[in-house]
Amino acid sequence: LWLSGGERRRLEIARTLATNPKYLLLDEPLTGIDPVSIEEIKIIIKKLKQRNIGILITDHNVRETLKIVDKVYIVNEGAIFYEGDPISAVKDEKIKKFYLGSNFQL
């Protein structure tokens, strides 16, 4: 049996939901999958938020992740470098210099 990356992500989330969690940790849920699967995972995450399930996402796909989160934490050398909302994060000059790059836009 072979599953695509997006199918594996959906299966991992479904398997975890069987335990009725209050919180989910999603490690790199948007990495290594095609754009259609990214959109499907984002829809699933939005539905989980509507069910009041807390979600912690760690992902290097910053552009897509910032579109679905309420709060952003950027970690540098093991310490929280930034804490705030996604829109403020994108506008923050220190974050642009350190992490996003000067031309980053959502």
Report the location of each language-model feature.
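Conserved catalytic motifs of ABC-family nucleotide-binding domains
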Residues: 20
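Conserved ABC ATPase signature
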Residues: 1-3, 7
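Catalytic Walker B motif of ABC-type/P-loop ATPase nucleotide-binding domains
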Residues: 24-28
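A short, surface-exposed alpha-helical micro-motif characterized by mixed small hydrophobic
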Residues: 65-67
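Hydrophobic anchor residue at the start of the ABC signature
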Residues: 13
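Helical segment within the ABC ATPase nucleotide-binding domain
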Residues: 39-51
